[in-house]
Each structure stands twice: as structure tokens, then as C-alpha cells.
Regions:
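A generic short-segment signal for beta-strand/edge and adjacent turn/coil regions
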Residues: 13-14, 32, 97-98
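Transmembrane signal-anchor/signal-peptide helices with a preference for the extracytoplasmic
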Residues: 19-40
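Immediate post-signal-peptide N-terminus of mature secreted/exported proteins
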Residues: 37-49
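Interfacial alpha-helical end/capping and short helix-turn segments at domain and membrane boundaries
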Residues: 46-202
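N-terminal positive-inside, membrane-proximal cytosolic segments immediately preceding the first
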Residues: 1-16, 28-29
């Protein structure tokens, strides 16, 4: 009787131990899978932030060129006697270019929808990522407002020379030449901070 009870208890303990080991191993596998998914999601975030960074840098260069173009036209005398046709075409093209910017947040939205955000396990990193995307939104809004205001000032210019020699055109040029560059004024360093934090986490 003692042997059968002992054997029964041994079997029960073996089953319990087997179940416990199975759950422990499954838990480790699940955690490892979540860590892999988090790393993959963060790599997408990093790539998207780097792309946004590049777009902001490109727009910053364009707006610097726009200001230089306005200064060029303001430097000409009333008769434009010193203007070269090539320069007029180049700078006029810059000022009248159809520009806009749209910074992406698809990777962030995917991370939020996948419920992996809380699995990052690093509140400081999560906040840096959110702050970087908030900064992207602010920069894009500032840049697009700037471009809309510029377009409103310039209107539908048919003849560059006639417009920029007019009082209205000179006023528009002065405003453009004095405006700060929103892409350089805004704190785009937030994106680099988040990218570096992701690199450290990975």
C-alpha cells in the first residue's frame, strides 16, 4: 500500500514538475519572441525617424535657398540691368517651386497597434520616441504654414520680372528674406536623441 501511495505521489510530482517546466520554457520562449518583435519594431521606428530627419534637412536647405533667392532679387536695381537670365530663372524657380513636407509616423502607429509599446520596458526610451514624433509633427506644421504664407504673398506670378519689380513683389521678397527657417529653428535634435537611444537599446 505504501509503495502504491509513494508511486502515485511520485507520478503526481512528475506531472506537476513537467507542467511547471513546460510553462517556464513556454514563458521564456514567449518573452524571447516579444523581445525580438520589440527590436524589429524599434528598427522600423529608427529608420522612419532617420527618413524624417533627412526630409527636414532637405527642406531646411530649400528654405535657405529660398531666402537667398529673395535676397538676390532685392539686390537688383529697378531696371534689373545686372540680372543674368540664368540667375533669374534659377532663383525664380526656387521662389515659385511647389514645396511641401509630410513626415511619416506609420512605424509609431504600428508599434502602438501591436501593443508592444509597453513591452519596451524602458520608459525613458518610450518618452524620447514619443517626443521625437511630436517634434516631427510640429516641424511639418511650421514648414507647411511657412510655405502657405509664402504662396499667399506671391500669388499666381506669371511674369517674374514684372512681379518682383512691383511694390507688392518687393514687399513679398523682403518678408521672405527676413523670415527665420522653421526647419532650423525647431528643435530637430529630438529626433537624433531618440535615434541614439534606440541604438543603445538595440
Amino acid at each position: 500500500m505504501k509503495e502504491s501511495v509513494s508511486s502515485f505521489l511520485s507520478n503526481v510530482l512528475s506531472v506537476i514538475l513537467g507542467i511547471a517546466i513546460t510553462f517556464a520554457v513556454q514563458g521564456m520562449i514567449d518573452r524571447s519572441q516579444v523581445r525580438r518583435e520589440v527590436r524589429s519594431a524599434l528598427k522600423l521606428i529608427r529608420t522612419e525617424l532617420q527618413s524624417n530627419q533627412a526630409d527636414i534637412a532637405t527642406m531646411a536647405e530649400y528654405l535657405d535657398a529660398e531666402r537667398d533667392a529673395a535676397k538676390y532679387f532685392l539686390s537688383l536695381d529697378d531696371g534689373w540691368t545686372g540680372a543674368s537670365p540664368d540667375s533669374v530663372d534659377l532663383y525664380g524657380g526656387i521662389l515659385l517651386a511647389d514645396a511641401s513636407i509630410a513626415l511619416s509616423d506609420d512605424a509609431l502607429e504600428l508599434l502602438k497597434m501591436s501593443s508592444l509599446f509597453q513591452s519596451i520596458g524602458n520608459d525613458a526610451l518610450s518618452m524620447k520616441i514619443i517626443h521625437a514624433y511630436d517634434t516631427c509633427e510640429l516641424i511639418a506644421a511650421a514648414l507647411n504654414r511657412h510655405i502657405e504664407a509664402r504662396n499667399a504673398r506671391l500669388g499666381d506670378v506669371e511674369d517674374i520680372r514684372t512681379f518682383f519689380m512691383s511694390a507688392e513683389g518687393r514687399k513679398a521678397l523682403r518678408l521672405i528674406s527676413l523670415q527665420a527657417n522653421p526647419a532650423r529653428v525647431a528643435d530637430a535634435e529630438d529626433l537624433e536623441t531618440a535615434i541614439q537611444a534606440i541604438d543603445k537599446y538595440l
